[in-house]
A protein has these predicted regions:
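Glycine-rich beta-strand-centered segment in the early N-terminal region that forms part
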Residues: 21-38, 48-91
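Short, surface-exposed secondary-structure boundary micro-motifs
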Residues: 35-36, 71-73, 89-90, 105, ...
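Mid-domain Rossmann-like dinucleotide-binding core that forms the NAD(H)/NADP(H) cofactor-binding site
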Residues: 120-122, 126-194
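Glycine-rich phosphate-binding loop and adjacent beta-alpha segment
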Residues: 220-292, 325-328
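C-terminal capping/lid region of NAD(P)-dependent oxidoreductase domains
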Residues: 285, 290-299, 307-328
């Protein structure tokens, strides 16, 4: 099968297109014909340092939307020909290929009327945002939610999901993305280039503080983020947790969460959490079907164009999701 291959740890520019054998499914697994996959920052981040369990050449990618080709031993819940989408693992060969093998308990159905491209935007970005908001921060109606990097993949879904939960949403982005973020549902938009983000957010929230923060940028803003939280507020860190040794004591109960779906797939011992990926995917797709959120596919490319597109993604400031069509 055709795949995007990594011969050793390195940058996106080191990736190449090549041929490898089609894998076979194990017990309770399925072989899926990949119709579409989307790009995520985790792809180039793990490529840079590699993983001790990888066999090279390695296939990157964690987002799959496709059709079940072959059923593994013991699998009775899915059938050949079913259309599915799911978050696979970066610890084994991933989605930048014509076929992928994964445990079927992570699958969710692609309903009629939803394209493979639309479904492919959801697994990593939408499930990360959904996990942060509904499995960790437990956002409720009336909460004030701050989303950093609101025009990105996770950020865009976080804005939509928070708004679907009837929260008041503040998004940070550049001036060129302000309309896009407002169209996603943000009530207030802060231009991080021309405004003091934390002072403006504090002014918007007032004395009550912010209930939930989704930080897609990195740990450098940790102290400032925590200073915005109100009583029992929470910070969900998508790109690394802050150095807690420099965090001052706060006079109220807060929570800090490190969100990383890839770790859930590290071991069969985490099956309960893996099954929740499938449940979250189904819950997110239901919101798509009823129009509460929409997929954010901003650009469609070919499998061969993935290396160059990953280079652009690594440079930052990509709006929405880049999706590769792999097979029909």
């Amino acid at each position: 099968m055709k795949a995007v291959l990594l011969d050793k740890p390195g940058p996106p520019s080191s990736l190449r297109i090549g041929e490898i054998s089609i894998p076979g499914p194990g017990v309770d697994e399925a072989l899926v014909r990949v119709c579409a996959t989307s790009l995520n920052p985790v792809d180039y981040k793990v490529a840079a340092h590699g993983y001790e369990g990888w066999r090279y050449p390695h296939v990157l990618g964690v987002d799959v939307a496709g059709v079940i080709e072959t059923i593994g031993e013991g699998l009775v819940s899915w059938n050949r020909g079913d259309q599915v989408f799911y978050h696979t693992t970066w610890r084994k060969d991933g989605s930048y290929a014509e076929f992928n093998v994964a445990p079927a308990h992570t699958f969710a159905c692609i309903p009629e009327g939803i394209s493979f491209v639309e479904a492919a935007t959801l697994p990593c970005a939408a499930l990360t945002a959904y996990c942060a908001l509904h499995r960790r921060l437990h956002v409720r109606e009336g909460d004030i939610v701050l989303v950093h990097a609101a025009a990105g993949g996770v950020g865009g879904f976080a804005v939509q999901l928070a708004k679907a939960a009837k929260a008041f949403v503040i998004g940070t982005c550049s001036a060129s993305n302000a309309k896009y973020v407002r169209d996603l549902g943000a009530d207030e938009v802060i231009n991080y280039r021309s405004e003091d983000v934390f002072q403006r957010a504090k002014t918007i929230a007032g004395d009550r503080g912010i209930d939930a923060i989704i930080d897609n940028i990195g740990p450098g803003n940790g102290v400032d983020n925590l200073g915005l939280l109100g009583p029992e507020g929470g910070l969900a860190c998508i790109a690394g947790v802050p150095d807690l040794s420099v965090v001052p004591d706060l006079p109220y109960s807060i929570s800090i969460h490190d969100i990383g779906l890839g770790g859930v797939m590290a071991s069969p011992a985490f099956r309960r959490r893996q099954e929740d990926l499938g449940r979250m995917a189904t819950e997110v797709m239901t919101l798509v079907q009823v129009g509460r959120i929409r997929p954010t596919a901003a650009e469609e490319i070919t499998l061969e164009a993935i290396p160059k597109a990953l280079e652009r993604l690594a440079e930052g400031h990509v709006r929405g999701k880049i999706v590769a069509r792999v097979q029909s």
